[in-house]
């Protein structure tokens, strides 16, 4: 009996090892990442990794019953169920509504397993059918090959993204260089009028100098004009005024206040009035000969008193 039981265990272990050599059973049925799974849910008929086995245990034995391939002993019923199902047929039923080769997110693996087996969201039928009725498609590939193709696709996408980034950076560099060239051309075009204005500056400088020369010549012409000549009549008038006697000072008058000027002159003495008015007239004499005019009042010591002056001063009848 003991030998038969031990032989059964050994035969069951050999069957499980042979099942693990199949392509679809080399990768975990749930996460599809970890290879060489050493755990299994015998009622569901799937081989899983140690991480997913912990999630299966949390679902409860009414959903999944987990055993170790190496450490636990397997019965004939358990081994037969694993032989009937396997990862390929199990996923054909439990993931029927998912896209082929779907790989769940590593951070949401627990939610994925719970939704897959407990809520039965992606099952093919509400009732679990016989595994022999589930025929895998001819063009289906093992999960390991799918993962390899996914890795290749990811690498190609990353390389294409890198090439796109390099192309975009090269385009940006070209655009930047073009903008710099345009800005340099614009700056040169803006600086060219300044150069033209610099070349025209000497002509603008000569114009004020010419005007200054004209102004200086006009001023010099004014100063260089001949001085006006004094007419002969003005010279004769000056000589006449020089020969006339000058009025005497008030010291030789009478004892009365203001002397002979106390009474106003009558109309009959027109000669005296005209005589005293003569020095007050303005003649044609210019300021060019200031020394020709005699001072209106001179002292008694400058020249001798004439008889006419004494008559004018001492004669009282003249002022009547």
Curated annotation (Swiss-Prot):
Location of the region described as Disordered in the Swiss-Prot/TrEMBL record: 153-212, 227-261, 284-320
Ranges of biased composition (kind: Polar residues): 183-210, 228-244
GO BP: endoplasmic reticulum to Golgi vesicle-mediated transport; intra-Golgi vesicle-mediated transport
Cellular component GO terms held in the UniProt record: clathrin-coated vesicle; cytoplasm; Golgi apparatus
Chain ranges of zinc fingers (C4-type): 28-52
GO MF terms held by the record: GTPase activator activity; zinc ion binding
Keyword Metal-binding: yes
Compositionally biased spans, kind Low complexity: 154-176, 245-257, 295-310
Location within or outside the cell: Cytoplasm; Golgi apparatus
Ranges of residues in domain Arf-GAP: 13-132
Protein name: Uncharacterized protein C824.09c
Protein source organism: Schizosaccharomyces pombe (strain 972 / ATCC 24843)
